[in-house]
Amino acid sequence: MIRIGTRGSLLATTQAATVRDALIAGGHSAELVTISTEGDRSMAPIASLGVGVFTTALREAMEAGLVDAAVHSYKDLPTAADPRFTVAAIPPRNDPRDAVVARDGLTLGELPVGSLVGTSSPRRAAQLRALGLGLEIRPLRGNLDTRLNKVSSGDLDAIVVARAGLARLGRLDDVTETLEPVQMLPAPAQGALAVECRAGDSRLVAVLAELDDADTRAAVTAERALLADLEAGCSAPVGAIAEVVESIDEDGRVFEELSLRGCVAALDGSDVIRASGIGSCGRARELGLSVAAELFELGARELMWGVRH
């Protein structure tokens, strides 16, 4: 029996259940084990709780032998590698884009100046301000139902959340606008899951690897390399999205490449630095580092310094 650790929220258990069900479909026995994390217990802003707020307890449970594997929202994992563990599988990614849920079916551009928009993410807040729509950004915590209720109750005019979370909970009907990357770059690894286990458990690593999706792994590897090189945690105002795209060589043959777009935003929305690049899927990390280097050249370090101080 493979014991899969998960946070206790409905979204987390729903995500972990997709991994459990895929393992069972592959002929393996698997069950979910709920682990409480600091991020679930505290209502303080995520950025104030530090790195690994949703993942440390799950890793401790693996280390203690309480669970064999853990399912994380990949964007919550610290960028610094922990040699005790390995991400054995990255299943096919859900839609990485952000989504708006607004009153009266409105889009961001239709909301009146001064409308209250809730988000838990400095990245979203910075990019929302950069759109110059005159919206008032408000902090937002709690599970997805709690966040959605802020709109239906009239406390907020709109919220911006990950579309993937709404999809996994069957709440896409609530979406009034899906934000394209040109409007708002998502968080690195948004919409992707990381299935982690102890690095020394080679038998389990091999079993979990059956769930791995090569395109998703390449995209997430590039996005996370960019994030790590910027020395930015999961709550920093950094956006990135990579996609496997088809290109044509000089002989007319179709081949696949990896396209990466990244940005760093000032928290007040006064500046957004953007860069992009393209490379081979097998050199995803190098692509991430290359785009990060371009962001640095364009002034990302100074923008990040302003964020940190």
UniProtKB/Swiss-Prot annotation:
Q: Which GO terms describe its molecular function?
A: hydroxymethylbilane synthase activity
Q: Where is the signal peptide?
A: none
Which UniProt keyword terms apply here?
Porphyrin biosynthesis, Transferase
Q: Which reaction does it catalyse?
A: 4 porphobilinogen + H2O = hydroxymethylbilane + 4 NH4(+)
What's a BP term from Gene Ontology annotated to this protein? heme biosynthetic process
Cofactor note as given: Binds 1 dipyrromethane group covalently.
| InterPro entries in the cross-refs | HemC, Porphobilin_deaminase_cofac_BS, Porphobilin_deaminase_N, Porphobilinogen_deaminase_C, Porphobilinogen_deaminase_C_sf
Annotated S-S bridges = none
S-(dipyrrolylmethanemethyl)cysteine sites (modified residues):
C234
Determine if Secreted is one of this entry's keywords: no
In terms of Pfam families, this protein maps to: Porphobil_deam, Porphobil_deamC
Taxonomically, the superkingdom here is Bacteria
Q: In which pathway does it act?
A: Porphyrin-containing compound metabolism; protoporphyrin-IX biosynthesis; coproporphyrinogen-III from 5-aminolevulinate: step 2/4
Required cofactor(s): dipyrromethane
Comment field (misc): The porphobilinogen subunits are added to the dipyrromethane group.
Query: What family does the database annotate?
Result: Belongs to the HMBS family.
- Subunit structure of this entry? Monomer.
Q: What does this protein do?
A: Tetrapolymerization of the monopyrrole PBG into the hydroxymethylbilane pre-uroporphyrinogen in several discrete steps.
Name of the protein this chain belongs to: Porphobilinogen deaminase
Native source organism of the sequence:
Mycobacterium tuberculosis (strain ATCC 25618 / H37Rv)
